Each structure stands twice: as C-alpha cells, then as structure tokens.
From Swiss-Prot:
The keyword Transferase applies. The active site is at 33, 81 (proton acceptor). Its cofactor is Mg(2+). GO terms for biological process: polyprenol biosynthetic process. SUPFAM superfamilies: Undecaprenyl diphosphate synthase (SSF64005). Mg(2+) binds at residues 33, 220. This is Isoprenyl transferase. GO terms for cellular component: cytosol. It is an enzyme of class 2 (transferase). Its EC number is 2.5.1.-. Binds 2 magnesium ions per subunit.
Length: 256
C-alpha cells in the first residue's frame, strides 16, 4: 500500500485545464524542505538556498491567492531548528524581515492576510516587529490567510494545549471527563483555522517532522520530489490536481 502511495505522489498531470477550480482544498499546508541540499548541489552556502526558498514562497503565495485558496500554512522554522549553526539560524530569523519588506505591498494589493503560529517569545525582536507590522497592515484583508509556522512544533503545541485545558478545568470545577476533541481544538494555536485537507512536503522526504500532527489526521499527503527552491507554480498546481484525484474517506469506505 505504501509503495502505491509513493508512486501516486510522483504522478504528473500535464494540462493546467485539468484543475477543477470548484474542488480546491480550503487549507493547504507545506513543509518547505530542501533549501540546504539545493545550495549544496550548486556548491553555494546554505543561506543562498534559504534566500531562493524565500522567492518560492512568493511564487506559491501568488498562485494560492490567484486560485482562491483560503489558507496557506508554511513551516518556516521548527522548534528543533535552533540546533542548526548559529549563522544559519540568524539568517533564517532575518528572512521574514526581508520577505515582508519586499513583498508586503503586493500582499496588501492581493488582499492577503498575514498570520503566525508558534512560540514567538523566542524569536528576535526585529523579526517580531516586522511580523506584527505586517499583521497590522493586513488585518482587515479578506483573501488568502498566509500563516507562517515560526518556532513551531506539533508536540510542544499539544503540551501547551493540555496545560491550558488543565487551567480551564480547574477554573470551572470540571474534570477529565469533560475533555473532548472540540476542547482540544479550541486550545490549539490553529483553533481559528480548518484542518488542512492537503499537506505537501518537498524534497522527496516522507515524514511530517512534528508539523500539525493533530490537525493533519485526515490530510492528504503529497511528497513532491522537487527541492523547495525549484518548486514553482506548476508544481503547486500539479499537487492540487493529484489531491483532486484522491477520494477522501475519513476512515470510511470508498463510494465506488
């Protein structure tokens, strides 16, 4: 079964008009993987790969916005990424500043709203200021919600939600019998977003790396072979077409 899944993820659909604009996922999440390997293949510093990856974010954001997708969540920096070399971490942490400096006017024009999930208290002040400025400038926009997961980890998110639930139970005189899925959802960082129907990971790696582990329970996974800087609008649309070829069962039986 797993071999069939991998084979299907490599499927290519060549014609753009095969994309059904009335059957798009509402929420797409992407693990943007392969920046370092892209740079290494070209004998360039790893930070060059991250720079080119930033350009891909612009491309995919434009595509998602133009197609009318409502939510795009991008795994920008995980809670585990702090173990990387200091100069690389510093460069990645400064990328949102550069990204928003160059791209914010277009995001505003495209009616895109910037939001974040993650533990931002550990993020540098200059990065936080750039993000908060972008949030303020786009807070009334009603198009695509572009959600950056920064210093985010799925396990840490669940631990935080459990602590928050415990506090709520204590305040309200409740006990563990009152805990259900809706209560957990309410205390997650993503509580105001629908679960992603589609989760894409680039670079050919086939794992979710602690990303949206609660929310992706019924997501369709596509493991794309392209390194993130090489992922473009056509690859994004091809992933959407593969998604449309799937039948989502949510644990039930096929309708066929």
């Amino acid at each position: 079964m797993f071999k069939k899944l991998i084979k299907r993820n490599k499927t290519k659909i060549s014609h753009n008009d095969d994309l059904d604009l009335h059957n798009l996922p509402e929420h797409v999440a992407i693990i943007m993987d392969g920046n370092g390997r892209w740079a290494k293949k070209r004998k360039m510093p790893r930070i060059k790969g991250h720079y080119e990856g930033m350009q891909t974010i612009k491309t995919v954001t434009r595509e998602a916005s133009d197609l009318g997708i409502k939510y795009l969540t991008l795994y920008a920096f995980s809670t585990e990424n702090w173990s990387r070399p200091e100069n690389e971490v510093n460069y990645i942490m400064n990328l949102p500043v550069n990204f928003l400096k160059t791209f914010l006017p277009e995001l505003i024009e495209k009616n895109v709203q910037i939001e974040t999930i993650g533990f931002l208290d550990a993020v540098p002040k200059s990065t936080i200021e750039a993000i908060e400025h972008a949030k303020e400038k786009t807070k009334n926009n009603t198009g695509l919600k572009l959600i950056f997961a920064i210093n985010y980890g799925g396990r840490a998110e669940i631990v935080q939600s459990m602590k928050s639930i415990y506090d709520e139970l204590q305040r309200n005189g409740q006990d563990s019998k009152d805990i259900d899925e809706s209560m957990i959802n309410k205390h997650l960082m993503t509580h105001s977003y629908p679960d992603p129907e589609l989760l894409i990971r680039t670079s050919g790696e086939q794992r979710i790396s602690n990303f949206l582990i609660w929310q992706s329970s019924y997501s369709e996974f596509i493991f794309n072979e392209k390194l993130w800087p090489d992922f473009d609008g056509e690859e994004f649309k091809n992933c959407l077409k593969i998604y449309q070829s799937r039948q989502r069962r949510f644990g039930g039986l096929s309708k066929e």
